[in-house]
Amino acid sequence: MNVSIFEDVIKDVDCYVDNILQEGFEDVQVGNDLFRNVKARGVDELVSFLNKNYPTYRPDLNFVRRSPINQEEPNWIHTDEMMGDLTAILYLSKKHPKEDGTTLYYKGEKMCIFKSRYNRLVVFPSKLYHSRNIYDNFGYAESARLIQVCFLKNNI
């Protein structure tokens, strides 16, 4: 299993986040699951970074998600296996609880805990079970948890 952590991925992250917030968010129904406060992104600075650092993969789905406190989420501990081969999560909350981040699991046990940091990117195999560290999310409106997720598929 290969896991990667990158710091300071987006050059002008404050402007990047401002643009995301200005575009707004929407709710998307996928089968029985309702994904709240998401917004699809096209080819952006994160995708360019991933293309450069993962040349044998192609970004398939790229979106941002804002998760205010007590927002119902369709999944807790889950895999993204059906979405791609790698999952990339970019933390975009400038202010966040120290517990914020992502936990990876192996055979039902916590294996690795990533701590959120503004403009930090974590990339891991999509088949791994994982969850956000704070079940109920945090913040309100512009202070809510903000992440960008991109799924990558192997070109080979």
Regions found by a protein language model. Give the residues of each.
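Non-heme Fe(II)/2-oxoglutarate
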Residues: M1-N75
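Catalytic core of non-heme Fe(II) oxygenases with the double-stranded beta-helix
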Residues: P68-I156
